[in-house]
From Swiss-Prot:
Key word Heme present: no
InterPro entries: Cell_Polariz_PKAAnc, RGS, RGS_sf, RGS_subdomain_2
Superkingdom of source: Eukaryota
SUPFAM superfamilies noted in UniProt: Regulator of G-protein signaling, RGS (SSF48097)
Name of the gene this protein is made from: RAX1
Originating species: Saccharomyces cerevisiae (strain ATCC 204508 / S288c) (Baker's yeast)
Role, per record: Required for the establishment of the bipolar budding pattern. Involved in selecting bud sites at both the distal and proximal poles of daughter cells as well as near previously used division sites on mother cells. The RAX1-RAX2 complex performs the asymmetric localization of the two cortical landmarks, BUD8 and BUD9, at the distal and proximal poles, respectively.
Alphabetical keyword list: Cell cycle, Cell division, Cell membrane, Membrane, Phosphoprotein, Transmembrane, Transmembrane helix
Annotated transmembrane regions: 298-318, 326-346, 410-430
The protein's name: Bud site selection protein RAX1
PANTHER family in the record: A-KINASE ANCHOR PROTEIN 10, MITOCHONDRIAL, A-KINASE ANCHOR PROTEINS
Gene Ontology cellular component terms for the protein in this record: cellular bud neck; cellular bud scar; cellular bud tip; fungal-type vacuole; plasma membrane
Upper lineage: Eukaryota, Fungi, Dikarya, Ascomycota, Saccharomycotina
Modified residues (Phosphoserine): S167
Membrane topology, record value: Multi-pass membrane protein
C-alpha cells in the first residue's frame, strides 16, 4: 500500500514539474514525456542530421542490453532463493544440482546476494576444489552432460546450464550468458568496429575507448554493463549538449515545421531495418503548406500584401472615401498573419487550439500511413486543415510546451494587429487624388 501511494505521489510531483519547465534529456530518454517532446519525435528530429541519429540508436540498443542483463540477474537471484523449496519436490537430479549450488556458494564462486558478479565473466581464475570438481562430475552424470562439457569450470556457464534445464521443466524462457554476449558483440559490430561494416558506426569516439571495448567484448568475451560506461557517458553528453537544445528550440518554440529530410534514405544500400523504423513517420503530400509550410505561408502572405497594396492604391487614385478604403484591412490582415506566422514558425490559431504539426520526413518509397494519421488527429478540429493538412496535426500534451506556444502565439498576434493597423491607417488616411 505504501509503495502504491509513493508511486502516485511521485507521478503527481512529476506532472507538477512538467507544468513549470521543459523536460530534460533523461526524462525524454526514459519515455516519461508526452508529445511533442517525446522520444519518438526526438528520434525523428535527429534523423535529418548525418551520424547524430546513430548515437540515439546506440543509446536505445544499450538500454536494451542493460535491461537484458538486469533481467538475467533477477532470474538468477530468484532461482537461488527458490531452489531449496524446489529441491524437496524433485528427484535425484535436483539433489545433485542443489549440492553443486551449495558448494559454489560456500567456496565463494557464487554469491546469492550479488548475482551480478556473474556478468563479469571472469572465467576460471579461481580453481575449483577437489570436492567441487567431484560434485560437478556427479551433476554432469545425473544431468546427462558429457564430462568434456563445461571443462573451463566457468560458473556462468554452469548456472546457464542449470537454468536452461529448469526452463525445460517449467516451460518458462530463460536468459543465458550466451544471449548477453551475443548482445554485447552486436553492439560492438554495429557501432564500433568499422564504418564499412555498419552504416550506424559511431564517429568521433576516442580510439582508446573504442579499442578497449572491442578487446573486452570480442577477445575477453565480457558482456557486463560497465564495459560501455565511458561510451554511454560520451553519448549522453553529445545528445544533451549538441542535439537536445536544438530539438527543444524546434518543437517547443514552434508549432509549424517544414518537412525534414532523412539523410539515410538518400544513400546507397539502405537497409530494410531503417525503412521499418521510419514507417509511420513518412509523409507524402502535394500541398505546399504541408511540405514547406513556412516558406509557403510567407509567399502566400506576400501575395495578400500585394493585393492589399493594389486595392489601396486603386482606391486612393480613384479618390474613394476613407470609409471605403478601410476594406484594405482584410488583405493586410491575411498577409500580415501569414508572414508573421511563417517567419516565427508559430501559427496563432494552432496555439489557441493547443495543436502542433508533427515532425515528418519524406521517404521516396513510402506512402501515407492512414491508420496512424487518423489515430493522432481524432481530437483535431477539421477547420485547422486549411494550412498544413489535418493529418500533420497532433495535440500538444506537454503542459509547459502548450503554455509556451500559447504565449508566443499571443506575441505573434500583437505583431499581426500592429502591422495590419499601420498599413490600414496609412492607406485609409492619406488624401485621395483622382488621376
Amino acid at each position: 500500500m505504501k509503495e502504491e501511494l509513493s508511486k502516485v505521489s511521485s507521478m503527481q510531483n512529476f506532472e507538477m514539474i512538467q507544468r513549470e519547465r521543459l523536460p530534460t534529456l533523461y526524462e525524454v530518454l526514459i519515455q516519461r514525456t508526452s508529445q511533442p517532446v517525446d522520444l519518438w519525435t526526438f528520434y525523428t528530429f535527429l534523423s535529418q542530421f548525418p551520424y547524430a541519429i546513430n548515437y540515439l540508436d546506440f543509446w536505445v540498443d544499450l538500454m536494451t542490453h542493460t535491461r537484458l542483463c538486469k533481467n538475467y540477474i533477477e532470474l538468477v537471484r530468484k532461482s537461488l532463493i527458490n531452489f531449496p523449496q524446489e529441491q524437496q519436490q524433485n528427484g535425484s537430479t535436483s539433489t545433485a544440482t542443489f549440492d553443486l549450488l551449495n558448494a559454489l556458494i560456500e567456496e565463494g564462486h557464487l554469491d546469492p546476494e550479488a548475482p551480478d558478479k556473474l556478468l563479469e565473466n571472469s572465467g576460471p581464475d579461481v580453481p575449483f576444489s577437489p570436492k567441487l570438481n567431484e560434485l560437478l562430475g556427479d551433476w554432469k552424470h545425473q544431468s546427462g552432460i558429457g564430462q568434456e562439457a563445461l571443462r573451463n569450470e566457468d560458473v556462468a556457464l554452469i548456472v546457464d546450464e542449470i537454468m536452461k534445464r529448469r526452463s525445460q521443466q517449467d516451460g518458462k524462457p530463460q536468459i543465458t550468458t550466451k544471449q548477453l554476449l551475443h548482445s554485447a558483440v552486436g553492439l560492438c559490430n554495429t557501432y564500433l568496429v568499422s564504418p564499412e561494416q555498419s552504416e550506424r558506426y559511431l564517429s568521433n569516439i576516442p580510439m582508446e575507448t573504442r579499442n578497449r571495448i572491442i578487446e573486452s567484448v570480442q577477445i575477453e568475451r565480457k558482456y557486463d554493463i560497465e564495459i560501455f560506461d565511458d561510451l554511454k557517458n560520451l553519448t549522453y553528453q553529445f545528445l544533451e549538449m549538441d542535439c537536445f537544445p536544438k530539438f527543444l528550440s524546434r518543437v517547443a518554440l514552434h508549432n509549424i515545421h517544414d518537412e525534414i529530410s532523412d539523410w539515410r534514405f538518400h544513400s546507397v544500400g539502405v537497409t530494410n531495418e531503417k525503412s521499418n523504423r521510419s514507417r509511420g513517420q513518412t509523409h507524402i503530400s502535394r500541398s505546399p503548406f504541408s511540405n514547406h509550410t513556412s516558406i509557403s505561408r510567407i509567399g502566400f502572405g506576400l501575395l495578400w500584401l500585394g493585393i492589399g497594396f493594389w486595392i489601396g492604391y486603386v482606391l486612393i487614385f480613384l479618390a474613394y472615401s476613407r470609409a471605403i478604403r478601410v476594406v484594405t484591412v482584410v488583405p493586410f490582415t491575411l498577409g500580415c498573419y501569414c508572414i508573421v506566422c511563417g517567419m516565427y514558425q508559430v501559427d496563432i490559431v494552432y496555439s489557441w487550439f493547443g495543436v502542433t504539426q508533427r515532425l515528418l520526413h519524406r521517404h521516396k518509397n513510402a506512402g501515407n500511413d492512414e491508420g496512424d494519421a487518423s489515430s493522432d488527429t481524432d481530437h483535431v478540429p477539421m477547420i485547422l486543415a486549411v494550412f498544413g493538412g489535418r493529418r500533420r496535426l497532433t495535440r500538444i500534451e506537454h503542459p509547459f510546451t502548450r503554455q509556451l506556444l500559447r504565449k508566443r502565439g499571443l506575441w505573434c498576434l500583437l505583431l499581426v494587429v500592429g502591422a495590419t493597423a499601420a498599413f490600414t491607417v496609412i492607406f485609409s488616411c492619406v488624401p485621395g487624388r483622382r488621376v
